[in-house]
Amino acid sequence: MRKLLRILLRCVSVVVALCLVLAGVIAYNHNRYKMPGENPRDSSVVAQQGDVESVTGNYLRGFYYPAHGTARPGTIVVFGGSEGSNNNDAARALQDQGYNVLGLYFFGQPGQQAELVKVPLDFFQEALDWLKQHQHQGPLTVLGVSKGAELVANLAVRYPEIDNIVVFTPSAYTYQGLGDYRNGASSSFTWKGEPVPYVPLRMPLRTTIRSILALPVSYRETYELSLAEAPDREAARIKIEEFA
């Protein structure tokens, strides 16, 4: 009995030691590879830089960047990506070039979805209403990066008011939302209260391990695998040909 107890204690000691080592590795990697700079979702950082006006609504959150100098025709709406920013850098660069810009958040702000899951595409109507109320005229251009580009493509096929789109690292498909999966997977976006058809994510084992260890991860393999195994790719495809 004592011998069995000693064996069990040794096993427990080994498990505890391994857990401590793993926790140390994760903490080290998290500190080493953490993103530099301010929290991209911290809207106070944008406000403190000045030269912007806060824009709020039921879901609408962001800032208006009035053009520097003589304003060019139209307005540009910009979105960030999965980091949750309003693409402040792009908005200010365009502002400097004489464009009126709306830099909007689409999740992560008070009154919005906390994570990039089930973001209502309907919120863009608030942006259109804001522009109309403030007498903005001319072409409407919408710009997005990565998941923001996926958002922009989905908006473009649903809102005829959009004249032009600019998308960086876009997707031809709507993918699964990014967030807490304990309640199950869901789409990144909804439309009129219903989830937009999406491609479920299938993460390779190597990517899963690197994520657990807080190591830098490339998600290209994840998205390629997810698309290859998608049960209905066509349903999830963004019908961008409908954008005229």
Where are these regions (language model features)?
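Catalytic nucleophile-loop/oxyanion-hole region of alpha/beta-hydrolase
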Residues: G108-Q137
